[in-house]
């Protein structure tokens, strides 16, 4: 082949090479293949161990050449007090690690917290978090207890009772803890209609000013029993 045909073939070959080169360039991220010289932690974490985060990042891949950032991100998010991590490469050689801490919404047991997703994290000193509602039960039941807390809090607020905690025993019996120190025993059935009995009885219960309520037992089908502070030590109570 000579003349115009040869020139056309050569032109087509050159065009193909240019297209292939452009495609490779578009799919090639040079930053992923450059060594990282520095690490910057952002997000102003207050509780997460930034030294441990730095150590984990540095140990992940020597020189950080070709580091799989997704794998590293998952490892960092599994660390205590880390809810989410974003990794960004900053020109020319910086890896930015943006840390978002979990938002605690409740205490759990003796030394853990529950975040807004229902996940447990800790151990922590709960004295710093005593303003949060206290939940207790078997691990894995925290979402159920969170929902129960919201339900009973809303129902008892109608009578001026403040719920500060909910406990589920090993036999799935429920106890509600009030801000004044009183306990409300629910048994295995958290029936909001039974809570209505307490709401309706609240004015009469508050009319007695000589002793605070220690315990309210709602495990009766059609009534409740009240133990006052001086009677609680003897496990007594007045049925209504």
Swiss-Prot record:
InterPro entries recorded: Cell_div_FtsQ/DivIB_C, FtsQ, FtsQ_C_sf, POTRA, POTRA_FtsQ_type
Membrane-crossing segments per the record: 8-28
Pfam families attached to this UniProt entry: FtsQ_DivIB_C (PF03799), POTRA_1 (PF08478)
Residue ranges occupied by any POTRA domain in the UniProt entry: 34-102
Presence of the UniProt keyword DNA-binding in the record: no
Cellular localization per UniProt: Cell inner membrane
Gene Ontology CC annotation, any one: cell division site
Cytoplasmic side: 1-7
UniProt-listed GO biological process terms: cell septum assembly; FtsZ-dependent cytokinesis
Function: Essential cell division protein. May link together the upstream cell division proteins, which are predominantly cytoplasmic, with the downstream cell division proteins, which are predominantly periplasmic. May control correct divisome assembly.
Family statement: Belongs to the FtsQ/DivIB family. FtsQ subfamily.
Name under which the protein is recorded: Cell division protein FtsQ
Source organism of the structure: Thioalkalivibrio sp. (strain K90mix)
Gene name of the encoded protein: ftsQ
